[in-house]
């Protein structure tokens, strides 16, 4: 038996629990101390010896880890599928007949209240599931946690399919499936961020958003394929396909590595080393792997010594956790306030308003643009950084929304809303809606998930991510529920509301959101603790790579006025 194997056998989880209960570090046990000493031997040497980092390899070397992360990211497809299909369901005749009401003349319709509830209650389930079920990732591991929440999602789908003519049964099913998707939305980006190589982390976490867009697009296509049926095939077939997506994800979990940070936290040091080695395509005993494990263990040990994390700790400013939580919740909230779900939830309804004969087809066009554009987003997030992309995204979406709303308000109905709409104005609105979707899909669609997944320290990560993601779901509910009422009252003036939010987003990112491109999760944590100013964060250097003349204090202070910061050429 090798020395590594012998050490691994001496670190049982039961012993870890006993140590934790006595308020000692997981690394203070003799066996784990030996493991730690072995690892530190590779990271320590002469005082000026550079830190050993995992080397970058050719792109072909990362095919395996990329495929594994795509399997994890498939949870986003589940969410996207719901978004794409529900927008069509509320316009399908059989769905309206079963779950709607009747006018005095006998025609069926869905009231604005019922439409808003059916569409948006899913988000409330997601918010609750994200907060409650994300804890499974800390208790049983990210992989097991994902499998459990997918099973909960399936239960909700079964209830929806079994609904015959009671809208509240379908309503309850959407809440339960939302619980599962809420857990997925926290655990999927979390696991991807923890297993992916640092120089690919932004790209691979963005795959979660890519899967969302794929789900939306294929959901639109499925609605288009079933719209000509006159029975429940219209909506039950798209729901039935959810079983295939769920089973694919559960099967994929058997092939992906567990989070090395979770494994280190529960004392499985050897497995943590293997996870890092697999993800980075290097040997388990490579010095760079041992150095990486050492960095993870140092963070875990510090968190263990501090005791169990409580919900109250999220509101402490001691280690900048509160500031990070506010930033994460704001970024996720602002993603919804871009107005994306105004198009995705009600796209079919919107394009009916601009006079299209088949609004289902136009929804497919939006879905194609959304899906294809996300590939660009996967590239730019690592090429240009999180902060730069968010700034450009907010500016470009503002321009698109101004044109879209202005044409809708001033040109769509030249002779009044009771008269036919202008075809030219309608086409212009569709074009700028596509431009808007392109700008959103390349920036604000994937990057909030990236930023939130790499912002929080391990000890509060699941709690903080669940709160931040819950903010996204809450705003999704509000937009989904109130949009029918708002558009009924002010129509395309609604676009100006989103335009105002987009302007605010630009300045919020400029002043609050730091750049984290190319940093390990531990380095991101250090940057926050040092209080680095967001507009200086792109120039920040981790302690392990600093020269003798580096001034860390200067990164946390700036006497230059705001207007000079914004327009300075230096």
Curated annotation (Swiss-Prot):
**Segments passing through the bilayer:** 61-81, 117-137, 144-164, 175-195, 202-222, 237-257, 341-357, 364-381, 389-409, 432-452, 470-490, 492-512
* A molecular function GO annotation: D-glucose transmembrane transporter activity
Extracellular side residue ranges read 82-116, 165-174, 223-236, 358-363, 410-431, 491
Positions bearing the Glycyl lysine isopeptide (Lys-Gly) (interchain with G-Cter in ubiquitin) cross-link: 560
Topology term for the membrane: Multi-pass membrane protein
SS bond list? none
Q: Which residues are glycosylated?
A: 91, 228
Which keywords does this chain's UniProt record carry? Glycoprotein, Isopeptide bond, Membrane, Repeat, Sugar transport, Transmembrane, Transmembrane helix, Transport, Ubl conjugation
Residue intervals on the Cytoplasmic side: 1-60, 138-143, 196-201, 258-340, 382-388, 453-469, 513-570
Q: Where does the record place it? A: Membrane
Q: InterPro entries under this entry?
A: MFS_dom, MFS_sugar_transport-like, MFS_Sugar_Transporters, MFS_trans_sf, Sugar/inositol_transpt, Sugar_transporter_CS
| GO cellular component labels | cell periphery; mitochondrial membrane; mitochondrion; plasma membrane
GO BP, sorted A to Z = carbohydrate transport; hexose transmembrane transport; transmembrane transport
Concerning its family, UniProt says: Belongs to the major facilitator superfamily. Sugar transporter (TC 2.A.1.1) family.
| Protein purpose | High-affinity glucose transporter.
Indicate what this protein is called per its UniProt record: High-affinity hexose transporter HXT6
Q: Which organism is it from?
A: Saccharomyces cerevisiae (strain ATCC 204508 / S288c) (Baker's yeast)
| Taxonomy of the source species | Eukaryota, Fungi, Dikarya, Ascomycota, Saccharomycotina
Which gene carries the instructions for this protein?
HXT6
């Amino acid at each position: 038996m090798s020395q590594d194997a012998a050490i691994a056998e001496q670190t049982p989880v039961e012993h870890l629990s006993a140590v934790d209960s006595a308020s000692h570090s997981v690394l203070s046990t003799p066996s784990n101390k030996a493991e730690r000493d072995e690892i530190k031997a590779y990271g320590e040497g002469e005082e000026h010896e550079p830190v050993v980092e995992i080397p970058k390899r050719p792109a072909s070397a990362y095919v395996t880890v990329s495929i594994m992360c795509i399997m994890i990211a498939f949870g986003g497809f589940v969410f996207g599928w719901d978004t794409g299909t529900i927008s069509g369901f509320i316009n399908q005749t059989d769905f309206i007949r079963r779950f709607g009401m009747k006018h005095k003349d006998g025609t069926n319709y869905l009231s604005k209240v019922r439409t808003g509830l059916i569409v948006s209650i899913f988000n409330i389930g997601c918010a609750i599931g994200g907060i409650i079920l994300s804890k499974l990732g800390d208790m049983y591991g990210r992989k097991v946690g994902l499998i459990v929440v997918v099973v909960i999602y399936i239960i909700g789908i079964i209830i929806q399919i079994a609904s015959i003519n009671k809208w509240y049964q379908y309503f309850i099913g959407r809440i339960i499936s939302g619980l599962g998707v809420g857990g997925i939305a926290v655990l999927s980006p979390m696991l991807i961020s923890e297993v992916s190589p640092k120089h690919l982390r932004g790209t691979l976490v963005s795959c979660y958003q890519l899967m969302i867009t794929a789900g939306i697009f294929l959901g639109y296509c499925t609605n288009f394929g079933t719209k000509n049926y006159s029975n429940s095939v219209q909506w039950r077939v798209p729901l039935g396909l959810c079983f295939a997506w769920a089973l694919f994800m559960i099967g994929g979990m058997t092939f992906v590595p567990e989070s090395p940070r979770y494994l280190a936290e529960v004392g499985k040091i050897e497995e943590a080393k293997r996870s890092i080695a697999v993800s980075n395509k290097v040997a388990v005993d490579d010095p760079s792997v041992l150095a990486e494990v050492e960095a993870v263990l140092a963070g875990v040990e510090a968190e263990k010594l501090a005791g169990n994390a409580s919900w109250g700790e999220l509101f402490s400013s001691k280690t900048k956790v509160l500031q990070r939580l506010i930033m994460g919740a704001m970024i996720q909230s602002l993603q919804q306030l871009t107005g994306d779900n105004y198009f995705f939830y009600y796209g079919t309804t919107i394009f009916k308003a601009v006079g299209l004969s088949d609004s289902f087809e136009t929804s497919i066009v939006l879905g194609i643009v959304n899906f294809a554009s996300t590939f660009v987003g996967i590239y730019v997030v690592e090429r240009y950084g999180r902060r730069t992309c968010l700034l450009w995204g907010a500016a470009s979406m503002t321009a698109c929304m101004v044109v879209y709303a202005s044409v809708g308000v001033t040109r769509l109905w030249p002779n009044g809303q009771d008269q036919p709409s202008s075809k030219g104005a309608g086409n212009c609105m569709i074009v700028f809606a596509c431009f808007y979707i392109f700008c959103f899909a390349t920036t604000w669609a994937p990057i909030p998930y990236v930023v939130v997944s790499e912002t929080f320290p391990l000890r509060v990560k699941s709690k903080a991510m669940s709160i931040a993601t819950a903010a996204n779901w809450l705003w999704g509910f509000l937009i989904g529920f109130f949009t029918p009422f708002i558009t009924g009252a002010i129509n395309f003036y609604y676009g100006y509301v989103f335009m105002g939010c987009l302007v605010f987003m630009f300045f919020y990112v400029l002043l609050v959101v730091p750049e984290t491109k190319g940093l390990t999760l531990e380095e991101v944590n250090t940057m926050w603790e040092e209080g680095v100013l967001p507009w200086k964060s792109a120039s920040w250097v981790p302690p392990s790579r600093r020269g003798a003349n580096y001034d860390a204090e200067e990164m946390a202070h700036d006497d230059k006025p705001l207007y000079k910061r914004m327009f300075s050429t230096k």
